[in-house]
Amino acid sequence: MAAAGASASGLILSRPVTFVTGNAKKLEEVRYILGQSIPFNSLKLDLPELQGEPEDISKEKARLAAIQVNGPVLVEDTCLCFNALKGLPGPYIKWFLQKIGHEGLNNLLMAYEDKSAYALCAFSFALGPDAEPVTFLGKTPGKIVPPRGPNDFGWDPIFQPDGYEQTYAEMPKEEKNKISHRYKALALVKSHFAKAGYVFQTDSPI
């Protein structure tokens, strides 16, 4: 592990966590949700595009990132799962979105009455290159709708969470960040850090 040692109270000391992302919007949300609870830096890494279940993909990315960073890392994998399609596009939503766009994603469900879906977020944390990653899942149910709202963050315009009349894209940021799949997963991350008693050096985040 990349832990530097232990304090008198037995707390683990380490470098700040490196959150691996090249997505500015995602980074903005993570900073908003975590606040000052977990000091972290951000870094874009070229990690291989993996296939499999969301939790397995997230864990393997954390292992690979921890080796490159040689320290504690947090990685995220996000899915949009259509119930009528048995969970697809799932972890491949990024590529579906790039190829067919919001309209194409709606068209995938044209022949189905069931427009229900869920947003799934898998965060994996590895304390270092020799540590087994721990994974935290957040899930928000909703439905797929024709795109509404700003078109500047992935599939947000076509996902309307249950109990709301707005899509993710239409919601105020502070509202979305209280109910999103990302918020739910990060709440578990924060709880894990608090219970584990990690104490990290507080370098200024970048």
Curated annotation (Swiss-Prot):
- InterPro entries with a match to the protein in the record: ITPase, ITPase-like_fam, RdgB/HAM1
Record flagged with keyword ATP-binding: no
Q: Which cofactor does it need?
A: Mg(2+); Mn(2+)
Quick one: which residues bind Mg(2+)? 49
What processes does the entry annotate via GO biological process terms?
deoxyribonucleoside triphosphate catabolic process; nucleoside triphosphate catabolic process; nucleotide metabolic process
Which reactions does this protein catalyse?
ITP + H2O = IMP + diphosphate + H(+); dITP + H2O = dIMP + diphosphate + H(+); XTP + H2O = XMP + diphosphate + H(+)
Report the subcellular localization.
Answer: Cytoplasm
Q: Cellular component GO terms, alphabetically?
A: cytoplasm
Give the top-level enzyme category: hydrolase
Q: Which Gene3D superfamilies match?
A: 3.90.950.10
Tell me, what is one Gene Ontology molecular-function annotation carried by this entry?
Answer: nucleoside triphosphate diphosphatase activity
Copy out the cofactor comment: Binds 1 divalent metal cation per subunit; can use either Mg(2+) or Mn(2+).
Q: Residues that bind ITP, according to the entry?
A: 21-26, 61, 77-78, 94, 153-156, 176, 181-182
Protein family: Belongs to the HAM1 NTPase family.
Q: What is the protein named? A: Inosine triphosphate pyrophosphatase
Q: What is the lineage of its organism?
A: Eukaryota, Viridiplantae, Streptophyta, Embryophyta, Tracheophyta
